[in-house]
């Protein structure tokens, strides 16, 4: 089934070229189908890149999905024109009375700041609280995962000495869990972060299940037992060249950066990197969407009861 997006969203043509099935809003309105309504809070600087990465994965589902994009109103975007945000994005004030089957909150390159120093922290806290009664399942990615764990459970992030940067091997910890169904026992996934969460703090919270972790970089995937909150500390949505673009950006700016671990063939940054995590990314999003479809109330207003 297709994803339903705004008719003239710029990434639409790229998705169509890749074979992603897209349906325009005008056509979807004439279909007697209850789609899954998913809101994406995009905190990344390069909005279109993140849109493309997430829509590609959501579009692999057999379930029709209607997607809306949200941006924080208390932050002035530096890399995206206001006209683009006004046309394709909404604000929290505009949607806070609506209900959604799922919410995705992306990462953000602001790990050097304490959460309270982030200029949109209070707005994000409001969104976290709102999601308890207006969203069935929230998927938090990288920085958003750390922010959500801090807000909901009081777990603080910790700075690491060297950036966790590359493609690492992970092990599935809970067999036959609905989110990791079909995963191989071990799999690869990329990370790009300067902070971590102490695993002892996660294991001390009975409400949380750690589903996948790495001996090298710690926990990758965890979720509350009711699947209302899901956390990914890495970036399985990344494209093959995303880590390369980050690496070259920092290298060309003379910033301290190592070659991404286990990314380039033979660790040679003149060679073309391969996407070795694509399968697990598609499978995870397929599993998550399937669980949302199975468990979300048909009448989303029941979430507020």
Question: Residues of each region from the PLM?
Answer:
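Amide-donor transfer/coupling interface in amidating biosynthetic enzymes
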Residues: 1-74, 89-90, 95, 99, ...
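Cysteine-nucleophile active-site neighborhood
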Residues: 105-174
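Helical hinge/lid and interdomain linker segments adjacent to catalytic or ligand-binding clefts
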Residues: 85, 89-92, 108, 115
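Short, glycine/acidic-enriched capping/hinge loops at junctions between secondary-structure elements
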Residues: 50-53, 79-82, 115-116
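N-terminal beta-loop-helix "entrance" segment that forms/cooperates
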Residues: 73-86
């Amino acid at each position: 089934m297709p994803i339903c997006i705004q008719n003239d969203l710029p990434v639409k043509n790229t998705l169509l070229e890749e074979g992603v099935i897209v349906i325009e809003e005008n056509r979807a309105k004439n279909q007697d189908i209850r789609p899954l309504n998913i809101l994406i809070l995009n905190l990344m600087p390069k909005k279109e890149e993140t849109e493309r990465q997430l829509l590609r994965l959501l579009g692999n589902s057999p379930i029709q999905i209607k997607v809306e994009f949200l941006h924080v109103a208390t932050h002035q975007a530096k890399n995206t024109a206001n006209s683009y945000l006004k046309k394709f994005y909404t604000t929290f004030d505009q949607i806070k009375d609506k209900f959604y089957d799922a919410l995705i909150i992306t990462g953000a390159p602001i790990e050097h700041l304490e959460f309270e120093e982030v200029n949109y922290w209070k707005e994000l806290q409001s969104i976290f609280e709102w999601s308890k009664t207006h969203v069935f399942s929230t998927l938090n990615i990288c920085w958003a995962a750390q922010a959500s764990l801090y807000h909901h459970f009081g777990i603080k992030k910790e700075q690491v000495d060297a950036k966790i940067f590359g493609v690492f091997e992970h092990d599935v910890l809970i067999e036959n869990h609905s989110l990791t169904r079909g995963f191989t026992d071990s799999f690869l996934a990329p990370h790009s972060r300067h902070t971590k969460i102490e695993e002892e703090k996660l294991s001390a919270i009975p409400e949380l299940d750690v589903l996948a972790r790495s001996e090298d970089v710690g926990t990758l995937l965890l979720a509350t037992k009711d699947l209302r909150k899901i956390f990914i500390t890495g970036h399985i949505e990344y494209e093959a060249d995303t880590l390369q673009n980050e690496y070259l950006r920092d290298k060309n700016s003379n910033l301290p950066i190592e070659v991404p671990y286990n990314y380039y063939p033979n660790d040679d940054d003149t060679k073309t990197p391969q996407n070795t995590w694509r399968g697990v990314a598609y499978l995870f999003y397929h599993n998550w969407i399937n669980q949302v479809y199975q468990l979300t109330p048909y009448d989303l207003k029941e979430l507020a009861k």
